[in-house]
Amino acid sequence: MPAPRGILCRPRDIFTEQTVARLARTATITDLDAESDDGTGTVIATPIIRWLESQEAAGNPVDYFNQTVVVQAPSGTSEADVLVMLQALLDRHAMLRARVEEDAAGRWTLTVPEPGTVTAADCLHTIDVLTDDAVIQAGVRLNPAAGQMVSALWVKSTGRLVAIVHHLAIDGVSWRILLEDLNLAWAQHRAGQPVTLPQPGTSFQRWATLLAEHAHDPKVVAQTDTWRQIAATPAALSPASPETDTLNTAGNLAVNLDVETTQMLLGEVPAAFHTGINDILLIAFGLALAEFLGTGAERICIDVEGHGRDEELGADVDLSRTVGWFTAKYPVAMQAAGLTWSQVVSGDPALGAAIKTAKEQLRTLPDGLSYGMLRYLNDNVDLDAADPPIAFNYLGRQGAATADGSGDVWQICWDGLATVSPGVKPPIPLTHTLALNAGTVDTDTGPALCAIWTWAPSVLNHAQVSRLSQLWFDALTGICTHVRGGGGGLTPSDIVAGLSQEQIDELQRQYADS
């Protein structure tokens, strides 16, 4: 969190230390007179930005590569109000003002100008009704080379703001930061006060510099062979065709898991296996893929995306309020443990053993951030294998209900583009044959896991992906059944005693019988 009084305390420290006394020992004093880390100036391209650069080098258009969110404004909001809000965000968050510069070799760097140089009036267009053409034209106005990272539509008839931000400047976590700032700015503006938003802790500029430095750290370089072996795993699906498989021709399927199962996945299941929900979802995806593809115990390589905000790179790194594209992308080779599908869906004891084995496989992987650092930021390392054709990304919990019941808040509308045709998507080639983007959304009855599937129609069809989607949900349900029956337990990476899984299981059996 920011340190307005010169004390640095990160959110994760609160959860780790849990008492005021222990928290006080971890908090550090910052120098309020030190030069501000405002994120302006030259920004080194990060691994994920280098990846996008490689997409352009391959002939794929990237100017329209964006994230779009629809925000419902408080009742009575005017266009003038929106301009004030948008200007506050542009001035506070440096990457929203970034400009891409390309050298003679096609290599990118980014430059961030001072606050005030990008105006909200140049980014915002007002319309009466949201239409396909309006969204298309707003997307076309994005121009990273000209510093046009933001293009927004104010829809007067509905009081909604359509925010289109180039992916170079935004990720899923960033939207939560922007929404928080929108509401803070709104409260100040409505009270007649000048809008003053808190400064982010660590700028994206400094973060990019840290990544470039760590890419040459001997400990990071030592992980090269491990990544090379993983990346060499044979592809489980044919690649997408860049000529025919594009965003506007891709197959799409969105399915929600029931609330009861989702609630178990958010709490009891990760606790039972001493891991995070990301690992559980990925392990279940690996089981479903093995059944779908009929690969048995063969390894399946998956291109995994993580949030990439690893604050361990520096003692004083605080990214809790930093807007930018932090995504880490890296290959993971999943290996099913020879289970029958009936064992999976029934929650058989063998499923628990398979989950523990897969969990340990994931724990032995290097930090996912290091793959991109080595591949894109260290010219002395050769990691040039093609990306796996299957992708997985868990976006976390989306759309949490606001605690303010007055309606005088800005809220993201997750169905805000429901009336817009899929045809507004640009003809950008798909980067994966199959992609699963999952997130937990709040519904009227509770949280529900939402699976959004995207696939290349030259390789897969709707019926096949529908079956795979059901297999994934069946695997997750089977895991929940296993935990309800008392399944779970520790694995070797959870303890420091150096015990094998067999020894841990035997101790747990003895303890259970005592």
Where would I find each of the regions flagged by the language model?
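Extended, hydrophobic beta-loop-alpha segments that form or line the acyl/peptidyl-thioester binding
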Residues: 9-12, 93, 97, 179-182, ...
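Short, compositionally simple motifs enriched in small residues
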Residues: 1-2, 23, 82, 281
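His-Asp-centered acyl/peptidyl-transfer active-site segments
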Residues: 38-41, 58-66, 83, 94-95, ...
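Short amphipathic alpha-helices and their capping loops
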Residues: 21, 25-60, 83-131, 146-148, ...
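Active-site-proximal acidic secondary-structure segment that organizes catalysis
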Residues: 3, 150-205, 464-481
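Phosphopantetheinylated carrier protein domains
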Residues: 1-18
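Acyl activation and transfer enzymes in specialized metabolism, enriched
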Residues: 74-97, 163-180, 251-297, 348-355, ...
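Acyl/amide activation-and-transfer machinery of modular secondary-metabolite enzymes
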Residues: 48-74, 103-130, 134-137, 146-151, ...
